A protein has these predicted regions:
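Extracytoplasmic juxtamembrane/flexible linker immediately downstream
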Residues: 1-44
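Extracytoplasmic
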Residues: 19-23, 30, 67, 77-79, ...
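Soluble periplasmic/extracytoplasmic beta-strand elements of cell-envelope proteins
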Residues: 23-29, 34-37, 83, 93-95, ...
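Short acidic, S/G/P-rich loop/turn micro-motifs used as interaction or catalytic elements
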Residues: 32-35, 142-147, 170
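Periplasmic peptidoglycan-binding/anchoring modules of Gram-negative envelope and division proteins
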Residues: 43-66, 81, 115, 122-134
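Extracytoplasmic/secreted envelope proteins and their assembly/folding machinery
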Residues: 53, 57-61, 110, 114-117, ...
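Compositionally biased alpha-helical segments
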Residues: 61-124
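A non-catalytic structural micro-motif
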Residues: 139, 156-172
Length: 181
């Protein structure tokens, strides 16, 4: 009886990623996949349909395409979807999805967005790849390895970054700690 299982709270680790993650969670179960949008279930998919399902394929393509983008927040709390281009003195250049370049003073960004900009600068100074905010995190149930294997193959084929987290048990999943991250 699933109601008797404890709720599993998924939280960010101390990996240094901080609150700048914008993951797409996909639960891998014996029956197939359960795809989350935010903290809520968006759709479910049987294992046999994973490699053929257009909705799933399009989701993975979208996550791969948007990997360089993230939600930047102004000091007034206004969100903006853009990718980091460069820093020039006190100004940061961002580019939105329409290709428009936006120059903002670092002081016009929230502290969290300023910290994210520093991560880009540090990565570039060290000649490492830019940090990605958008990727898939597979939440793998004990009997969900077949679904995970097929879904991760789709990610690899589409060039979508992904990670995995094994789940110990069958309880409900709580993703609320990622809301608004």
């Amino acid at each position: 009886d699933p109601e008797k299982f404890a709720t599993m709270v998924v939280k960010q680790s101390g990996s240094g990623a901080g609150g700048d993650l914008e993951p797409t969670f996909i639960e891998c179960r014996a029956e197939g996949l359960r795809v989350y949008e935010g903290a809520k279930v968006s759709f479910e998919l049987k294992t046999s349909q994973i490699s053929k399902d257009a909705k799933f394929q399009n989701l993975i393509k979208k996550v791969a395409r948007e990997a360089p983008y993230r939600t930047w927040v102004s000091s007034q709390g206004t969100p903006m979807d853009a990718r980091y281009v460069k820093r020039d003195g006190l100004f940061i250049t961002l580019k939105d999805k329409n290709g428009k370049e936006i120059k903002v003073q670092t002081t016009q960004l929230s502290r969290a967005s300023q910290q994210i900009a520093r991560k880009y600068e540090d990565a570039r100074k060290a000649k490492r790849p830019d940090p990605s905010a958008r990727y898939v995190i597979f939440l793998i149930r004990g009997k969900g390895t077949s679904a995970w294997s097929q879904a991760s193959r789709v990610c690899a084929q589409q060039g979508c970054k992904y990670g995995q987290l094994p789940l110990d048990g069958e309880g409900e999943i709580d993703l609320s700690l990622f809301s608004g991250s």
